[in-house]
């Protein structure tokens, strides 16, 4: 009989064999290992190293070396409906130029999902860092806890966006949870927006990197909501009968939030204008075009480029994602939750 350690190592190696480079900006991977979400949620996490140590034990390696950096994300999200009646969710992830990784997961006690990972979490932000080298390749095992957005088999989708204000550090006696573990938990455990709101409310949030974050959620029923934290209290912004399209960038929508720099208001207004002109109905390719128009592309004061690492349009009814990576909008890919490892170039 194989030992638990041997089984874990075999699953880890099987996962890494699926790691595939599509081009300079995009990788894919099918995660075949256990990442132990249930036990991590039970014991809680207050920082990156809590999840890293937990994951190292699950996959039997000490080669997972996270290096998240406080350089400033600048993202955009919105929900809408396409002409066929499907509910869609658009997302730009703007950050230090680096490849992104599309990762499929299929936990034993959760929903299957496909998510997009910011590889700066484990390859230090260098755009063409060779993940194929063994020492770097092992770091891809951190993918389940480095997802920034994704969709699951029920059509529930989520994305995180940064706010430039002090981090949320709740201390109400609930089990602590960090930003990326909350995203993973929502994808694995929630079928609807309401279930995700309930999940977030059941934990004490501990933000990463000394910054605050908010989240937009969407599901196959057409429901969307925004979760924000102001002064360590959780707030939920919901749709109303006159406003089905919610939009999020990098400033608070909750009254009392610190919007000292109004970052992202221009992007918000451009998205809002376009959706209003279309009465909230927009084709997926047009949604991608809108994302391209609000994507950031500039040189940071520290010398690196800030771009849209990826632009994604999730279809909550198809359980799919239309994706462009590295601001190359001439290359469009489609990925489905139920087709792990399948790369559809459009």
Across the structure, where does each feature detected by a protein language model lie?
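N-terminal mature-domain region immediately after signal-peptide cleavage
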Residues: 1-190, 282-346
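Short secondary-structure junctions and interdomain/linker hinges
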Residues: 96, 193-194, 203-211, 278, ...
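Extended amphipathic alpha-helical segments with heptad-repeat/coiled-coil character used for oligomerization
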Residues: 210-255
